[in-house]
Amino acid sequence: MVILFDQFNLPEDIYKVIFATEQQEIVGKMLIKYMQDNGSEIGKTEMSVFATRLHDGEAIIKEKGKSPFDKEVKMSYNKRQFYDRILTPMRGMGLIDYDLYKKTYKISDKFNKLMVKVGLMWIREIEKNKKEGAMKQF
């Protein structure tokens, strides 16, 4: 997945940086919240149940409040698109880790480590170009 952002208009919400659409942001937040509610680790079956509930429109975004005007808001998201556009990119970026032996998904801090690594790669590139002299004209 490619993340493009503007340093001067960087959103406060990480999900706005990572995902292209508002619906993807909501589903990504729902997934992380679901995982955190279950000890930051869920099994393959639990992930499938989560995706199926989304697909069937049974996932609740906003629970019904005490006010008569508060409505329970349910959301629907295609199961295949959930795996293609939410889970697979989150695994690829290191936000979620999959343990092949335990067959569990776990919230990971690899994303942070990768962003630090990308920053260090950029600094090395700048230093390399300084040593070689000014960048050659094309």
Please tell me what each predicted stretch does.
Residues K102-D109:
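Minor-groove-contacting beta-hairpin "wing" of winged helix-turn-helix DNA-binding domains
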Residues G43-K71:
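DNA-recognition alpha helix
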Residues V73-M93:
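Short amphipathic alpha-helical interaction segments
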Residues K110-F138:
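Short, amphipathic alpha-helical interaction segments positioned at domain boundaries
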Residues M35-N38, K44-A51, Q137-F138:
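Long, compositionally biased intrinsically disordered regions
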Residues M1-S40:
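Long, low-complexity, charged/polar intrinsically disordered regions in eukaryotic proteins
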